[in-house]
A protein has these predicted regions:
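Noncatalytic, beta-rich nucleic-acid-contacting surfaces in large DNA/RNA-processing enzymes
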Residues: 1-671
């Protein structure tokens, strides 16, 4: 139809040939691909009905025809969907069995109050189908009270029918009256608050109002859904005539037909929606009644997806107010488990750690007499550390998994080579059956001498833990700053979520940077999305070029910052725009304070204090500095002996708390 193409074809033979070839291949499939869950069934061998194709990347046979051609060839196509959620449910049920709680998930009550309270409060992190922020917002508005509400929401939450969610919620909650379309069909739409939601409703309306058979109603639905104009033109007079015979006037019948035509285009199959809703309800029921087993089941399915595990950790601690036991070679299993109403972190969830190696640790522990390792040397004797590998062992140390055996992680990390050699010697001796005459193999081998090193500071432990786990688990870098942040009017994420419900808020927030993505606008201006965490959760802040220019050097992973933000709420989702940012030690510095006084009870403690101060003096990330004085309080002396150590040492809440943890330090005071 394009005149210029016609002219080009007349002028050049090659263009004419190209257009001729193009017309022949236009509309044909460009590649062979397979549906993830599509299976075709025929009444005879498939090669007698359709051409087949062997995918070179698999052993699977596929048809060369597309979906529509397959159906026209007389084959029936089914989609057999496999859901990871079914594994989540089975994981949770298996964990419940370990404490003799046997549940037939297919026969649970469908009117459990706790489950619908969970839905209505939108506490649906990890609940199938309803964990997105949009779904959570819809749940808060709908306040579901029955399984039919969940079925309807699954069907409505798609482009097109989504616009009917507000009307459904308003009618359900009595804010709006249900509008009658026609008395003949009101009962059909009662369960969906007067809105056509399902394909089955389209068929039933055609059957009841216009006298269609079920087969005829299905043909009508298909014609409407696929917008087949010829079929629609043929169906309208048939529908009008049938409706008239049932006493429906022509105008109303035409209105209903138009309504059916509109909704049939995106009406959802009710049985499909119901199947998904039941699975959603089962996950919600498990979360409402057995939250730890459910969350452990979820986390076992996302073992190495750090971003998801971080969200689930936040949900367990801050959402469900339950506890997580950090990785521990004496308590943890290969996967996530539940004991004594606590979720035990999985050994395999650490970075660079495999399940086979962790199973060796668990097996050795269970074979021991006490069912636990007493110290790192017993671990070396019972577990062939060489088979675990140095990298996984390092991650176990960094995560604190050996803390019950030796709490000095820096010592263990530097001593791993000698421990692995010790373990190898013992196990080699066992293999060669050269054990001593009267004892176990290896008892005559001397235990290696461990390195002598200072313990990591609490802040260093968290950094190393983050390397191994992917997020902060046993604590948070801002824990030491809690009182200082409160004193300076800094708001937590949890508090900000509450404040913003009443409208936009200007506030100060503090957090540890975990990630950053830089972008450019259409005009070439820079902006960034920065991911930040505080002890109450995770959040994202948007920064535009003016703020980036002045604070970019602080916006790197691991840095603690204070931000002035403008907070708003969109569809129940917190939006933060940063107006200013600075390092936490700069933001919280108290200019009225000169420094610290460290009170100790013996001269021996002084060297430990000096060692710590020397270590933190090298920390470039600590911006506040001041004097440090040592005060020796000894009962044998008439008074305090004060010694000025220096006038420019790093001073911040993390340093203060690290000093307080030193044995022999009585107190630390600012002055």
């Amino acid at each position: 139809d394009e005149p210029r193409l016609k002219d080009a074809a007349k002028q050049e033979e090659v263009v004419a040939r190209l257009l001729d070839y193009s017309e022949k291949v236009e509309g044909l499939l460009r590649n062979a691909s397979t549906h993830a869950a599509g299976v075709v069934i025929g009444d005879r061998p498939l090669d007698e009905l359709v051409p087949l194709y062997q995918d070179p990347r698999s052993t699977m046979v596929a048809t060369q025809f597309s979906m529509k051609w397959v159906e026209l060839s007389g084959l029936v196509k089914f989609d057999f969907l496999g859901l990871k959620t079914l594994t989540v449910i089975q994981n949770a049920l298996n964990l419940l069995k370990t404490r003799n709680v046997i549940i037939d998930i297919g026969n649970i009550s469908l009117d459990d109050q706790k489950t619908f309270e969970l839905y209505a409060s939108a506490k649906t992190v990890a609940v199938f189908q309803v964990e997105s922020s949009g779904m959570m917002d819809a749940l808060r508005r709908m306040k579901p009270t029955c399984i039919e509400d969940i079925v309807a929401l699954v069907a409505l939450y798609r482009p097109g029918p989504m616009e009917n969610i507000p009307a459904y919620c308003e009618v359900k909650n009595g804010l709006k009256e249900l509008v009658s379309i026609h008395p003949l069909i009101d009962h059909i739409l009662a369960e969906t608050q007067g809105i056509i939601v399902y394909q089955e409703q389209v068929m039933e309306i055609a059957q009841v109002m216009a006298g269609y058979s079920l087969g005829g109603a299905d043909l009508l639905r298909r014609a409407m859904g696929k917008k087949i104009k010829e079929a629609m033109d043929a169906e309208r007079p048939k529908f009008m005539k049938g409706a008239e015979s049932n006493g429906v006037d022509e105008k109303k019948a035409s209105e209903v037909f138009d309504l059916l035509e509109k909704f049939a285009n995106y009406g959802f199959n009710k049985s499909h929606a119901a199947a998904y809703a039941i699975v959603s309800y089962q996950t919600a029921w498990l979360k409402a009644n057995y939250p730890l087993e459910f969350m452990a089941g979820v986390m076992n399915c996302d073992m190495h997806l750090t971003d998801k595990l971080s969200i689930y950790k936040d949900e367990i601690i801050n959402g469900l107010h339950l506890s997580i036991v950090p990785p521990c070679v004496n308590r943890s299993e290969v996967g996530f488990s539940v004991k004594n109403n606590e979720l035990i972190y999985a050994l395999t969830a650490l970075k660079n750690v495999g399940p086979e190696a962790m199973q060796l640790i668990v097996d050795a522990r269970e074979k021991s007499v006490s069912k636990k390792f007493s110290d790192i040397f017993e671990f070396s004797r019972l577990v062939e550390m060489k088979k675990i590998g140095k990298r996984p062992l390092e991650m176990l140390v960094r995560a604190g998994a050996f803390d019950q055996l030796n709490s000095n992680r820096s010592v263990l990390l530097k001593s791993l080579d000698s421990l692995v050699l010790y373990s190898a010697a013992i196990h080699d001796q066992r293999v060669s059956d050269q054990s001593s005459l009267f004892g176990e193999a290896g008892e005559d081998l001397l235990e290696p001498k461990l390195k002598e090193l200072d313990s990591w500071l609490a802040s260093e432990k968290l950094v190393e833990e983050h390397r191994a786990i992917g997020f902060y688990l046993s604590g948070h870098p801002l824990d030491d700053y809690k009182s200082s942040l409160k004193r300076n009017g800094v708001t937590t994420l949890a508090e900000l979520r509450t404040l913003v419900k009443n409208g936009p808020v200007i506030a100060k927030v503090a957090g540890t940077i975990s990630g950053r993505q830089d972008r450019k606008s259409a005009r070439g201006n820079r902006f960034s999305f920065v991911q930040v965490s505080d002890p109450t959760g995770l959040f994202e802040v948007t920064l535009f070029s003016d703020v980036l220019d002045s604070s970019e050097q602080y916006l790197v992973a691991g840095e603690n910052v204070v931000m002035s933000v403008e907070a708003t709420s969109e569809a129940e989702q917190l939006k933060l725009l940063c107006r200013a940012a600075q390092p936490i030690d700069t933001a919280l510095v108290d200019k009225s304070k000169k420094g610290l006084k460290v009170f100790v009870n013996s001269g021996g403690t002084i060297s430990s204090v000096a060692s710590l101060l020397s270590r933190v003096d090298k920390e470039k990330s600590v911006f506040g500095r001041g004097e440090v004085s040592l005060c020796l309080v000894d009962s044998g002396l008439p008074g305090e002996v004060e010694l000025l150590v220096g006038d420019s040492f790093p001073i911040n809440p993390q340093v203060n708390n690290a000093l307080r943890e030193i044995k022999g330090v009585l107190s630390v005071e600012e002055y």
